[in-house]
Structure formats: C-alpha cells, structure tokens
C-alpha cells in the first residue's frame, strides 16, 4: 500500500507529526507552502481571516498528482478554528484523487474548532472518501502514546 502525506506546517508541529506518521509506512511526505506575499505586520490577521472564510491561497507545489497512491493523508495546523488556506488549496488542486480514501489530522495549541468537519467537507468535495479525521494538541506531539494512536488510525484506514 502506497501512502502520501500532504501537509502544511508553519511552526514545525504539523511537520513533526507528519514525519512520525510517515515513518512506519515509508510514506512520501509532501510539504505544501504558501507562495503569496503578505505585509509582515498584518500577515497573521490576514491569513486567519482567510482560514475562517475557508479561502484558498497560491501554493507550491501548485498541483499534486496522487493517482499512484492508495491512501492520502492530510495535515494542517489550526488557524482561527479552521484548516489553513494552504491545505485547502492543496486539496482543491489534487489530480487523480477521485474515490481515494483519505485521512486528515490537524495540530493546534488551543482548540480544533471546526477543523475536523471542514477537512471532511473538503475531502468529500474533491470526491475522496474521508475514513478518519482527527486532531492533536501541541502538548501531545511529543507524547509517544498519542503518536502511536495516530499511526494506528492511519493503519486502520489502510484496511478500509
């Protein structure tokens, strides 16, 4: 079974979790980055507003072909109780995703808000099948038990 983990990470928390999930499966890791330029003083506010409104931004890589994968995993930090505009754009630009099973996780420092529901909707809108959606608090990203639970969730999704 071939896995692909597509994630966006600003502080490294989501990257850290994605790497831990990828390791036992030898999954391909694809980090998606925001290519839009923002005024430094308002960068945080503008991007949180975009997340809240479920907007998308310009990204690199601009599109991803996932036709060669059996399971797609998405990872995003939580901004203003939603997934980021970066991961939204990545999901929207996927090629070869129709009918594929997908797992999504988010990392957060407070509360996940509507992130799980938003992820599920975006995945379904692109014709994929959401088999698991979860989140992990930043205090738990070094917690071996929590990481093992995420890995087990992905492993269970392979059997779906």
What residue ranges belong to the model's regions?
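Alpha-helix N-cap/loop-to-helix initiation residues
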Residues: 10-14, 80, 111-112, 140-143
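A glycine-biased structural micro-motif
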Residues: 98-99
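N-terminal beta1-alpha1-beta2 submodule of the flavodoxin-like/Rossmannoid cofactor-binding fold
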Residues: 1-75, 81-93, 128, 135, ...
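Short, glycine-/small-residue-rich phosphate/pyrophosphate-handling segment
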Residues: 103-137
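Accessory recognition modules or surfaces
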Residues: 90-92, 109-112, 142-151
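Ligand-binding grooves and catalytic loops that recognize ribose/phosphate and carbohydrate rings
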Residues: 55, 121, 145-146
């Amino acid at each position: 079974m071939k896995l692909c983990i597509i994630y966006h990470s600003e502080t490294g928390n989501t990257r850290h979790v994605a790497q831990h999930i990828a390791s036992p499966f030898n999954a391909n890791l694809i980090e998606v980055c925001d290519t839009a330029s923002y005024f430094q003083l308002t960068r945080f506010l503008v991007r949180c507003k975009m997340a809240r409104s479920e907007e998308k931004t310009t990204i690199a890589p601009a599109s991803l072909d996932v036709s060669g994968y059996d399971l797609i995993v998405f990872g995003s930090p939580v901004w203003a109780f939603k997934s980021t505009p970066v991961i939204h754009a990545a999901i929207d630009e996927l090629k070869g995703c129709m009918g594929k099973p997908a797992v999504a996780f988010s990392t957060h420092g407070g509360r996940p808000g509507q992130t799980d529901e938003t992820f599920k909707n975006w995945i379904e809108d692109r014709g994929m099948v959401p088999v698991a959606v979860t989140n992990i608090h930043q205090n738990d990203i070094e917690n071996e038990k929590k990481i093992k639970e995420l890995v087990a969730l992905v492993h269970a999704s392979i059997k779906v």
